[in-house]
Amino acid sequence: MQIPKYENKPFKPPRRVGSNKYTQLKPTATAVTTAPISKAKVTVNLKRSISAGPTLNLAKKPNNLSSNENTRYFTIMYRKPTTKKHKTWSGDGYATLKASSDKLCFYNEAGKFLGSSMLPSDSDSLFETLFKAGSNEVQLDYELKENAEIRSAKEALSQNMGNPNPPTTSTTETVPSTKNDGGKYQMPLSQLFSLNTVKRFKSVTKQTNEHMTTVPKTSQNSKAKKYYPVFDVNKIDNPIVMNKNAAAEVDVIVDPLLGKFLRPHQREGVKFMYDCLMGLARPTIENPDIDCTTKSLVLENDSDISGCLLADDMGLGKTLMSITLIWTLIRQTPFASKVSCSQSGIPLTGLCKKILVVCPVTLIGNWKREFGKWLNLSRIGVLTLSSRNSPDMDKMAVRNFLKVQRTYQVLIIGYEKLLSVSEELEKNKHLIDMLVCDEGHRLKNGASKILNTLKSLDIRRKLLLTGTPIQNDLNEFFTIIDFINPGILGSFASFKRRFIIPITRARDTANRYNEELLEKGEERSKEMIEITKRFILRRTNAILEKYLPPKTDIILFCKPYSQQILAFKDILQGARLDFGQLTFSSSLGLITLLKKVCNSPGLVGSDPYYKSHIKDTQSQDSYSRSLNSGKLRVLMTLLEGIRKGTKEKVVVVSNYTQTLDIIENLMNMAGMSHCRLDGSIPAKQRDSIVTSFNRNPAIFGFLLSAKSGGVGLNLVGASRLILFDNDWNPSVDLQAMSRIHRDGQKKPCFIYRLVTTGCIDEKILQRQLMKNSLSQKFLGDSEMRNKESSNDDLFNKEDLKDLFSVHTDTKSNTHDLICSCDGLGEEIEYPETNQQQNTVELRKRSTTTWTSALDLQKKMNEAATNDDAKKSQYIRQCLVHYKHIDPARQDELFDEVITDSFTDLKDSITFAFVKPGEICLREQ
């Protein structure tokens, strides 16, 4: 036996599948005929001794590759069936559909036939249907329309025509006799012996300039690429198209799934926020009444801006606008070449991959529900940390959120929890693309650990949501603005020198007649407004009037009981006040005590200030036995009237849990079913309490702590709200009152504010009516502010003294300040005053000439009169459209509940301001 000689040759690589297919096929002699070889045909029966691969079969496979113009072509995505929660596609391909057929044929990218499936009965769901093709799941992605696209698809599919799948390689191949064995296939003899080399598939993306996938810029064959937006603007009714800069490659269009629900002010808000986060300069809009949201403007870049402050009033839909922006940035980007794209040139990922939402713990559930309501949680992954988690579990969840790309896109976390996971966030801060802070005014303290933690994350794109970001402190204003857009106002030292000092001096009552200081303060105020309006958006809830049911506002002045008057006198005498050294801070405890007396004298004994400064055992015992008050009597009469006269529910709001305790006891005694929410209720129980109240018709009342009611609670199950006492901060009361008059409310709303006549309650109300001036000034509410005046600090020590005075001989001290009408229910029209001109004249006279002591005293008296007139003017502006009603002269209060209860309340209500809703006016 001859043994082959061993030769040390290099390893010969295996033959590539598909090349030289038939070089091993050797026909027998009987296969040769006298006919020309090019025309001869043989019948070959291939047998495989080892391979289990498919036999050669040239029977025509289903395809729709004819040149018929009625054939439609689609791009597809396919995958193997899987039970994974988060499924991905394994490949792309094509589908064809003939006009004369109702069957789709599917092919992979190499032109290999995958299978076919019948069309769905609903043609509208063609692109939503998951087809079954062989062992694959297939979904249509995009229909090819352009001629170049169709040619590319035909060319790709035609590569596999006539070239059946090559047989798998076997160790032995035999070719038996050429007799026709069942007609398995026939081929020309010339093809049998020719060396057929399968052409390498040429990618579709290299055959056309349209709908190309992205390739590296270093590619030798790179050509001009064209990209397309995720949504076709021509197929969307009233689309929202974002603005862009000159470098943008595609338009960013808000998903119509959300866009169709947005109101005009919300459309503008989403576009404004997008511009800020993208660093675009504000566009110049000649006519603000024209809707510009359907057009994309090419704007300049503004390198100072990368964040936004949305300071809209409560109820304008800040959460929905934020979700719309988040969804837009997750799904879309104007820079398509920087992300992976589909075969059609459509970006597959957005500008942001991971977004951090930080909010009060009570709002975490509300945020997640809103995501589910508007988007469905199957579209977007939202992670919240369970309150039952251990710290280690929270840290692990945060790590997984940041490192696992496809599962979750949004993390919602409470401000307090943020501190416990700050280390994990810090390690992976480069993965966080956007930060959203709800109730952003909580970040106004520059020394806050939460604020410093958020600063350390160094997230470029930031969105802050708040109803009232500034009241009267420019230091806090700087802290918030510098966090949103660091450095835009310079350092704090320069900001203080340029803005705080001149503006504060201009607002100081001691400089009210210094023309130079006032002009400089006004100039600096305008300069700051120009800087901040580029990224601050503020709208009032007056926008909602045409969308929500009418609202009637009623301010009721309640006569104090004699026991309350005695309590006021005893406390003020026992306090031994030194008005020369008195400041607001030093008198805060006394102010709180007097507010409690307005609610009920029974609250006096447990007050810390009373125990430490005044304590009188005999008086304390008499107060504890006197739980009733003028406001409590009016409250219980109103509740009884609402329960008997209507089928509506009511919310009762107070700033003190002790007051809620008294009200709760009175409601229990009256048999009024109710639920309660205050600071002692765990966060995880609050959602269920609110849901139960809104849905259960058997629950009549809802007792709410004002501090708990200012964080997004939706109590639309009630249509009447009673604000039992007032807070110094008007935003607290406004937020609490907005709990019922918001989206989802179907009934006309009635808001009652109870004020004790002639006492500190009225002073707080007057303060509220004027305190918004600074907030309005820097946030753009120009309708109510006096543009020519920068003297916003209208309370001095004389005002502080007046806080502790009790007016027992008035029906309403507030009405006495602004009006002298008879209270017959008429809406008072106030003429324009020349108060500003008088003030300017006083300034000039006091600063330009020498003044004697007598003249100085005269000018000081004039100044005091001028200040009183100015206070009256500010209060009057806030009470425009209110009707003035004296119950002794007029018993119609534009509310059937109070009108019907007037017989019982005539001695308890001394005066009323009523701003009726539209329905009330029509009924009159």
Swiss-Prot record:
This is DNA repair and recombination protein RDH54. GO terms for molecular function: ATP binding; ATP hydrolysis activity; DNA binding; DNA topoisomerase activity; DNA translocase activity; helicase activity. A motif (DEGH box) lies at residues 472-475. Its EC number is 5.99.1.-, 3.6.4.12. It catalyses: ATP + H2O = ADP + phosphate + H(+). Interacts with RAD51 and DMC1. It comes from Saccharomyces cerevisiae (strain YJM789). ATP binds at residues 346-353.
